[in-house]
């Protein structure tokens, strides 16, 4: 893309339109001490070979060969090579947004297939094309429950990802939506059922839980669903580790499922871009946020795909929209679709079994090394909480020297758990690496 700078006459005309005589007048509202008065420190332009050398040097600084034991919403799973090969095709890998979407039948079919696979995976009847990520998906699911029930408050379990809770708080603040929280059972690491029952009122629109939760334990979704529904509220279940559905019964007792699909072939990528999704029952379809792709036939009787029920801000008046998110994570959803297709039902199940088996081995190894594993009598998938004598951050600093990236320290969000961290084990953690991590924690 060419760079076409503005001429001085262009700048003068723009200033006149704004009622300013000079650039200084334009920036007058910004205090002088915060304004840059020198040229930007930009190096000279590079030739092509120099640019390649520059990025090779930067790439050589990457940290390779580390054993990653941190999850907490972003999981280090194997990415089949075929994914990047397929998504790099020009039909997919483009900055173009199809504002006449029916022209791009291939894109719409890919979205439709993604929705179909998500429904099969979650046991729900309808799924949207995507949300930004798991956190925005959870927030949008609560707003959806508010619209469906006409009630005006929500309850969130403290075992939900802390940063998901922060995103929801931002949404709720600007919607004037009261949010309350319920704690967890100190023995099980699961939602405190009695506290939840006492917290639900006739104004509670939604109860949000996460399973597996932030501690890695699997919640009793059926029992919580019965309790929530008896009170006339809706149950929203957040899933941050999508691979768990390869082995664990999907929480179909929920009214709405919000899920982060990063585990399905999406690179960690410094936290994004990821792909959230909302799945729900068909009777709630008109309040689901985000894009929906439907299958139909054209006037010649041929199968075709269309965007349907487009009730987002991009298409209708803002105040009537179900969501103000105008971006669809179509390319990232395609990655997840390719991943699920490559592995298939049996492959996902086998991959999930490997995660569970290696995590069970890690729990045993950590205990043998003298570490205390919390909530160990509760069912888990691929994360567990380890409590140590030394500070978790200091421990991680020591482990880094052995090329081990340790667990996620909990003290910031759960001070009552002291020197504890959530450790994650996936199919990429070899037995030798698990043993080395356990030994490092013991020392």
Swiss-Prot record:
Keyword Oxidoreductase: yes
Gene Ontology molecular function: any one: glycine dehydrogenase (decarboxylating) activity
UniProt keyword ATP-binding, yes or no: no
SUPFAM superfamilies: PLP-dependent transferases
Pfam families: GDC-P
Catalytically driven reaction(s): N(6)-[(R)-lipoyl]-L-lysyl-[glycine-cleavage complex H protein] + glycine + H(+) = N(6)-[(R)-S(8)-aminomethyldihydrolipoyl]-L-lysyl-[glycine-cleavage complex H protein] + CO2
The entry's keywords: Oxidoreductase
GO BP terms, alphabetized: glycine decarboxylation via glycine cleavage system; nucleoside metabolic process
Top class in the EC scheme: oxidoreductase
This enzyme's EC code(s): 1.4.4.2
InterPro entries attached to this UniProt entry: GcvPA (IPR023010), GDC-P_N (IPR049315), GDC_P (IPR020581), PyrdxlP-dep_Trfase (IPR015424), PyrdxlP-dep_Trfase_major (IPR015421), PyrdxlP-dep_Trfase_small (IPR015422)
Subunit and interaction comment: The glycine cleavage system is composed of four proteins: P, T, L and H. In this organism, the P 'protein' is a heterodimer of two subunits.
Similarity field: Belongs to the GcvP family. N-terminal subunit subfamily.
Function: The glycine cleavage system catalyzes the degradation of glycine. The P protein binds the alpha-amino group of glycine through its pyridoxal phosphate cofactor; CO(2) is released and the remaining methylamine moiety is then transferred to the lipoamide cofactor of the H protein.
NCBIfam families associated with the record: PRK00451.1
Name of protein: Probable glycine dehydrogenase (decarboxylating) subunit 1
Species for this entry: Koribacter versatilis (strain Ellin345)
